[in-house]
Amino acid sequence: MASFIKAWGLVIISLCYTFFIAKLVPKGIKRLILFFPVFLIFFIVPFLIYSLHLLGITAFFIAWLANFKLLLFALGRGPLSSNHKPLSLPIFLAVSCLPIKIQLSPKPTKTHSHEGSTEGPLIYTIKAVFVVLIIKAYEYSTKLPEKVVLTLYAIHIYFALEIILAATAAAVRAMSDLELEPQFNKPYLATSLQDFWGRRWNLMVTGILRPTVYEPSLQLFSVLGPNYSQILAAFGTFVVSGIMHELIFFYMGRLRPDWKMMWFFLINGFCTTVEIAIKKTINGRWRFPKAISQVLTLTFVMVTALWLFLPEFNRCNIVEKALDEYAAIGAFAVEVRRKLTAYLF
C-alpha cells in the first residue's frame, strides 16, 4: 500500500505540472515536448507497485488512459480540452487519472438500442456477489475443465471491470455533481463486432482510442478514399489496443510477451474491417435476424478470447497472485476484527 500511495503521489504531482504548463504554453508541439517527461513517468509508475490489483488499475488508468488524454491535451483536443470553460484543478486531476469522461450534451432520451447502461446499485451488488463466487470457484480450478475456468475468467473480467469503472464514476459524480458518460452498454447484446467494440464494450477505451488513433488515421489515409481510410483506421485502432493490452499484462506478469493477446486484437480487428466492408457493399439490403447476429457476435468474441486472450491469465500467473492477495486481505481483516474485539470487550 505504501508503494501505491507513493506512486499515485508522483502521478498527482505530474498532473499538476501539466495543468500549470497548459496555463503558460499554448497547445502544440512545444506543450507536447514539455509533457514528454510525464509520459515517461506514467509508463514507469506501474513498476513501483507490487499489489497485482493496484498495479493493474494503475497501469490501465495511468500508463494507458492518462497518457493518451495528456497526448490529446497537449494538442488541444480530447476530454481535457473539449469543455466550454477550462477545468478546475480538482476536476482536471479526476478526468486525467480516472476512467471518466464528462458528458457535454444533455442526457439523451432512450429511443434506440445504444443508450448507456442504467443499472442500479442492486444489479452491481448482484454482480459483486457473482465475482466473490467466481473467486471461490477458482479454488477448485484444478478439478474443472480448462475452458470452464477460462470462461469464469471472462465473466470475472467483465463484472469486475464494470464494477470498478462504475464505482469510480459514481464517486466522482457524487463529489462533483458532473454528468458522466456510461462505461459499458450491455456488450452481451451486441449485434456485430463493430457494435461490440465500438459502441458497447469498455466505452472509455473506445472514447480515447477514437481521437488518438482512429480519427488521425482516418485523416492520414483519406487520400485512399472514404471506404479504405475507414477500414485502415479501424484496423489501426485494434493494433494500438493490442499493444496497450500487451503492455498491461507485461506490467502484471513481468514476462516476455508471446503476442497471443496481440493476435486476439489483430484477428478481431481484421474481422471487424471485413464486416464493415461487407456492410458497405450490401448497404442494408440484407441482414441476419437480431437474435442470430447477437449469438454469432458473442460466440466469435468468446471463441477468440478462449483461444488467445484468456490463456494469458494462466501464463502470467495472474489468478494465483490474485488469490494470494485475497487470502492476505482476509487474514488482515480477521486480525483487525480480533484486535477490535479484544479492545472493546
From Swiss-Prot:
What is the recorded membrane topology of this protein?
A: Multi-pass membrane protein
One of its GO biological process terms is: sterol catabolic process
Q: What is this protein called?
A: Acyl-CoA--sterol O-acyltransferase 1
What the entry lists under InterPro entries is as follows: Wax_synthase, Wax_synthase_dom, Wax_synthase_Magnoliopsida
Gene Ontology MF annotations: O-acyltransferase activity
EC number(s) given by UniProt: 2.3.1.-
Q: What is the lineage of its organism?
A: Eukaryota, Viridiplantae, Streptophyta, Embryophyta, Tracheophyta
Pfam families of this UniProt entry? MBOAT_2
Q: Per the similarity annotation, which family is this?
A: Belongs to the wax synthase family.
Q: What class of enzyme is it?
A: transferase
Q: Where are the transmembrane segments?
A: 1-21, 32-52, 54-74, 86-106, 120-140, 148-168, 231-251, 258-278, 291-311
Specify the species: Arabidopsis thaliana
The subcellular location is: Membrane
Q: Which keywords label this protein?
A: Acyltransferase, Lipid metabolism, Membrane, Steroid metabolism, Transferase, Transmembrane, Transmembrane helix
KO phenotype (gene knockout): No visible phenotype.
Assigned GO CC terms: membrane
Q: What does the UniProt record say this protein does?
A: Involved in the esterification of cycloartenol. Not implicated in the formation of sterol esters in flowers or during seed maturation. Has a substrate preference toward saturated fatty acyl donors (16:0 > 18:0 > 16:1 > 18:1). Does not require triacyglycerols (TAGs) as a fatty acyl donor, and is unable to acylate diacylglycerol to produce TAG.
